[in-house]
A protein has these predicted regions:
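The canonical Cys-X-X-Cys-His
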Residues: 43, 47-57, 120
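Extracytoplasmic electron-transfer domains, predominantly the class I c-type cytochrome c fold
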Residues: 62-63, 70-127
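Bacterial N-terminal signal peptides
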Residues: 13-24
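Short, solvent-exposed linear motifs at loop/edge-of-secondary-structure regions
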Residues: 58, 66-67
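N-terminal secretory signal peptides that target proteins for export/translocation
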Residues: 1-9
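Electrostatic cytochrome c docking/interface patches
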Residues: 26-46
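Generic anion/oxyanion-binding catalytic loop in active/binding sites
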Residues: 32, 43, 57, 78, ...
């Protein structure tokens, strides 16, 4: 090939590469990892120990219970359709949900201390 053809190919490849680099932040390639506060980190550990059997943290898809990604960022809670507030989430965790499908959600009120509940809520806010 002549030098002129190679120059054209190289320029074209550079334009494509530059376009990919510029599009990366918009496409999710360059997503930054969320840095959790100490309380949210403690809540994440509690979530992994108590909740992951039934709930996903990274998606909204149902496992046994609803996926909880964005649970406190949405307008309403999954299944109950109550407003997505800290108070409603805390009540759901404490009292459980006997009408949960396909299985009822057990109450965790007697299992989690006030500090544990606060840490868990702090973690759920990051989802």
């Amino acid at each position: 090939m002549k030098g002129r053809s190679w120059n054209g190919i190289i320029k074209w490849m550079m334009v494509v590469a530059l376009g990919l680099v510029m599009a990366a932040p918009m496409s999710g390639w360059a997503k930054e990892k969320t840095v959790l506060s100490p309380s949210a980190k403690a809540g994440q550990k509690l979530f992994e120990e108590n909740c992951t059997m039934c709930h996903y943290a990274d998606q909204t898809k149902t496992k046994i219970g609803p996926g909880l990604k964005g649970v406190l960022k949405n307008k309403e809670l999954p299944y109950s359709h109550r407003p997505a507030t800290v108070a409603n989430v805390q009540e759901q965790i404490e009292k459980g949900n006997a009408q949960g499908k396909p299985m009822p959600m057990p109450p965790f009120g007697g299992k989690l201390s006030a500090k544990d509940m606060s840490n868990l809520i702090d973690y759920l806010k990051t989802l």
